[in-house]
């Protein structure tokens, strides 16, 4: 009997394996046959292959979904076409009209096409659209967390239309082959799959065209359905991206005076994208306008001893950056602050990838990492080189080289060289490494004012030469119920990355992470996990820096709510030569989307923390809060108020080291998928400054944009003379028109 059971199990496993990788060979259609209007017409998709989405992968584990979905895929010489019919009660469909890459789209009903055009799991290109055809695209890489895995700054050009119909909704995609990276050749074999997100009793349901293995740590490797395409026409892109812009600014020179305006400041620049072949692209930008359309969300840094990192929003620097992402902070594109000219070469072959970037930076950022503090200065002009090469040895291993150089105009340099690797030993085990060393000569400059010392080296920039190194090793294991990793980090006292982001060094750091996870798939408990993370940190001088143990709990429950709780217990901690014991605090995260109309994001910390920026740091009572509800009033209008609050109180005197808040309010009206108007205001009690930013934007594709707006804010210098919450002391108006021209 046992033999029959074993045979039956083997047969079942083989059937699942075969089902897990299907092959689709659609017939080639004619462009004139398909009209992208969001309505699937009879005869329109007669050349297509039909694909059923038969697997609910979350919260169910590869079970048959209640929601039925059919997809149709075909192609022409120059485009890939996809249509999806998602059956549903129209009244229960969640969707709003959104601008491109609005992250709120992931809370909608949507459909998603995953493409692994190199069929090797290096990355996936994700093309999403909701029921109104609003788009979000991203690139996914093999990473441990969603934050590291998805890059939503990545952009592809594609066309979508969506319509809500009597039995659900329909979405049609038209994707130019010229916008998709893939290997050379007119005949292609890609990997792909299709996903639909639906909602059942308020809970998001992940439905796919192929099964998903929760025990496999490589999510992008599980895009394995084959798509066979023949005799494509490979079009090389030659694109020009000119822009014109203008700004008018002014400010008060005394508290009770009128605003005095400067002269209008016109500007112009040019970008160029040139396909050398299907795998290689050369990009050039001359006098680029890298001003941000929307202000960064202000972070509270009053109790931070190091510089804070902000996300990259500039499209030129975002393209191709998945190949230069490092755990050791070796590359940070925002360190290239204000380039006058920059060039970039990207090549993606079947077995290798290359990335080469040059820039003439007019206002260089200079950052020094210390054992407990970082030091940041604004410098002068420098020339930057970044080179990255990666070799894909086989499906389960890849290795690479990296170098970056920054040469300062008036002397000094920073060179960084390194190697890295990624190895998959089995479905459950993965090993990664990063090794770097730097050679530096400081400029002689007054960019940083500090009398501090880093061992035998002064923080002041006086031409000193030094060398440093960094090592990062990680062993990772993932099964159906256990997720674990062990990592080692080694940063020497003089490790510095002049084109990177390194804020702490002089540490040898070991981390052990071990978590149990389960998917009960119950109405009140779809997922839960609990575990621990332990850290042990020594310096290069062999004295103990920190011992820390975290308790971690996570669960998904009613009302589409995810709750994460962490207790961070610093058993021992050394800061600026002083020892502290039993410093513990809690962190609570709550993310809830109970309906299409309401979303809630909450982060709260409470417990003990150090007053890091006091002359003599002491332990205080900490409380901080971030709360942001979202209100989707209709399909086009959204309100997003938020508050960030932070307080640290002396345990003995009960006096506050600091106590303040940043309140922010955003209202957006989306006329259609390309045109919106929004208003952002913010008041910061730490600096006692107020600003308001109105903006109108038209953005029909990732590169073409027109916007007009302004910034109005108060100046804290005048607060004592004339205090008013909504006072305007400084103002700026700006507009920009940038248009993509294909040649």
Locations of the language-model features?
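Contiguous, well-ordered alpha-helical segments that form the cores/surfaces of helical PPI scaffolds
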Residues: 388, 418-420
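Exposed, low-structure sequence patches enriched in small/polar residues
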Residues: 338-340, 346, 414, 422-425, ...
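Structural preference for beta-rich elements and adjacent junctions enriched in aromatics
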Residues: 20-391, 400, 411
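A short local loop/turn or secondary-structure capping micro-motif enriched for an aromatic residue
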Residues: 44-46, 89-93, 135, 146-148, ...
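Primarily recognizes Gram-negative and organellar outer-membrane beta-barrels
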Residues: 233-264, 314, 364-383, 388-391, ...
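Short beta-turn/strand-loop junction motif enriched in small, turn-promoting residues
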Residues: 176-180, 406-407, 517-519, 682
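Bacterial Sec-dependent N-terminal signal peptides
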Residues: 1-25
